[in-house]
Curated annotation (Swiss-Prot):
Keywords: Electron transport, Heme, Iron, Metal-binding, Signal, Transport. One of its GO terms (cellular component) is periplasmic space. InterPro entries: Cyt_c/b562, Cyt_c_II, Cyt_c_prime, Cyt_c_prime_subgr. Binds 1 heme c group covalently per subunit. It comes from Rhodospirillum rubrum (strain ATCC 11170 / ATH 1.1.1 / DSM 467 / LMG 4362 / NCIMB 8255 / S1). SUPFAM superfamilies: Cytochromes. This is Cytochrome c'. GO terms for biological process: electron transport chain. PROSITE patterns: CYTCII.
Amino acid sequence: MKRMMIVAALAALTTTTVAQAADPAAYVEYRKSVLSATSNYMKAIGITLKEDLAVPNQTADHAKAIASIMETLPAAFPEGTAGIAKTEAKAAIWKDFEAFKVASKKSQDAALELASAAETGDKAAIGAKLQALGGTCKACHKEFKAD
């Protein structure tokens, strides 16, 4: 048992050290990538609705992927990554990080609601939840993303 605790402690220390040693520009590249993926998932959902595509479960799966990204998104904005590389992230993120986390959580919740609507197959409900998710994205961008 003692040995297991030592191994777990060393693993945690190693993980923390690696995270702290990461290149700040890599965080910028990472968050651009996941936010681009989020945008593409939303576009795919919109196309599926507009064109009435027969792609079973994809809308719910895409919405769940967005929710997963939003759940962990704040971790992609650690201290020391403001103004690194070419980024559209406003300093407001780090000035009021709690508000940024709340905005991310709102998007996560909206994405989960979209996933639930998608599982019913009700296109009107899916469309409404997609618009609601888009609204949370827009609100976050207004506050935290430079044009």
